[in-house]
């Protein structure tokens, strides 16, 4: 049976095995998908051994996306620009192909929500690894992006890297333009740490829809809770993005595109 896995550290909390095995059942694919704890010191050796033993592909989560990218032989454009991958596939010639399905997963979930139209103004909070993975697909979807982060130099470098692909502007968190935003995306890790993104409430009130790339089981993320406390109710967490990026990884491996919405709805119901 073809073997796949998700690698991360920590990994016990990962929903990827549940999601991927549901996608496999839906599409009648015979495969096994498991969670693997990566060793912070020996991850590269572990991953190469995993493929040498016959595995067909894997997902990569924190903190290994950049390290896994370095091990690949070939790359998609979106992985190359992000300098990180969340998906590896073993090709027929034995080479490793790296892709990053985070951004296309986000775009697919925004389409599910009917929140994606050309020429929207989008504010993204945060310029870390999560942001790097989503910028190219958003720009390809003709979004006008304002990228805000506490460390302006990091934001500026990232915006300059992606400027050839669309309209993107770098600002510091305390100089976000006072304009209306069709969509505000939280790409900071505030949703995981229990904090909230350090953005002025008056800025948030200029938004129409609010998407947190984090999710929390059975409760609101801090960012979603903050939005609701301001009376902003057009909100979504990132669980749909998680299922959608998994579906795009699955498609890369198996050549079949699952119906991610039905799997999302099943799992979301179970999480409440």
UniProtKB/Swiss-Prot annotation:
Pathway participation: Metabolic intermediate biosynthesis; chorismate biosynthesis; chorismate from D-erythrose 4-phosphate and phosphoenolpyruvate: step 4/7
UniProt: shikimate binding residues: 14-16, 61, 86, 102, 215
Cysteine pairings via disulfide bonds: none
Pfam families cross-referenced by the UniProt entry: SDH_C (PF18317), Shikimate_DH (PF01488), Shikimate_dh_N (PF08501)
Keyword Amino-acid biosynthesis: yes
Catalytic activity: shikimate + NADP(+) = 3-dehydroshikimate + NADPH + H(+)
GO CC term, one of those recorded: cytosol
InterPro entries in alphabetical order: Aminoacid_DH-like_N_sf (IPR046346), NAD(P)-bd_dom_sf (IPR036291), SDH_C (IPR041121), Shikimate_DH (IPR011342), Shikimate_DH-bd_N (IPR013708), Shikimate_DH_fam (IPR022893), Shikm_DH/Glu-tRNA_Rdtase (IPR006151)
MF term (GO), any: shikimate 3-dehydrogenase (NADP+) activity
Chain residues that bind NADP(+): 126-130, 149-154, 189, 213, 238
GO terms, biological process: amino acid biosynthetic process; aromatic amino acid family biosynthetic process; chorismate biosynthetic process; shikimate metabolic process
Keywords: Amino-acid biosynthesis, Aromatic amino acid biosynthesis, NADP, Oxidoreductase
Active site residues of this protein: 65 (proton acceptor)
The enzyme's E.C. designation: 1.1.1.25
Self-association state and partner proteins as the record states: Homodimer.
Purpose: Involved in the biosynthesis of the chorismate, which leads to the biosynthesis of aromatic amino acids. Catalyzes the reversible NADPH linked reduction of 3-dehydroshikimate (DHSA) to yield shikimate (SA).
Protein family: Belongs to the shikimate dehydrogenase family.
Protein known as: Shikimate dehydrogenase (NADP(+))
Organism: Haemophilus influenzae (strain ATCC 51907 / DSM 11121 / KW20 / Rd)
Organism lineage string: Bacteria, Pseudomonadati, Pseudomonadota, Gammaproteobacteria, Pasteurellales
């Amino acid at each position: 049976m073809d073997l796949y896995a998700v690698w991360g550290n920590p990994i016990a909390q990962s929903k990827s095995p549940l999601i991927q095995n549901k996608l496999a059942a839906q599409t009648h694919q015979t495969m096994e998908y498991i969670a693997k704890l990566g060793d912070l010191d020996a991850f590269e050796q572990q991953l190469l051994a995993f493929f040498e033993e016959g595995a067909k592909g894997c997902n990569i989560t924190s903190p290994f996306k950049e390290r896994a990218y370095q091990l690949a032989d070939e790359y998609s454009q979106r992985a190359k620009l992000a300098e990180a991958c969340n998906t590896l596939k073993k090709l027929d010639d034995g080479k490793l192909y790296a892709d990053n399905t985070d951004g296309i997963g986000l775009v697919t979930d925004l389409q599910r929500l009917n929140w994606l139209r050309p020429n929207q103004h989008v504010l993204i909070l945060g310029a870390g690894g999560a942001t790097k993975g989503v910028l190219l697909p958003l720009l390809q979807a003709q979004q006008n992006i304002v990228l805000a982060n506490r460390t302006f130099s990091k934001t500026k470098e990232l915006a300059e890297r992606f400027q050839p692909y669309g309209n993107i502007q770098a600002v510091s968190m305390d100089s976000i333009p006072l304009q209306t935003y069709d969509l505000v995306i939280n790409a900071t890790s505030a949703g995981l740490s229990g904090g909230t993104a350090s953005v002025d409430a008056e800025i948030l009130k200029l938004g129409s829809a609010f998407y947190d790339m984090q999710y929390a089981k059975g409760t609101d993320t801090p960012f979603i809770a903050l939005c609701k406390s301001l009376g902003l109710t057009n909100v979504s967490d990132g669980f749909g993005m998680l299922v959608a990026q998994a579906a795009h990884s699955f498609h890369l491996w198996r050549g079949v595109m699952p119906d991610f919405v039905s799997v999302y709805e099943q799992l979301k119901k179970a999480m409440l």
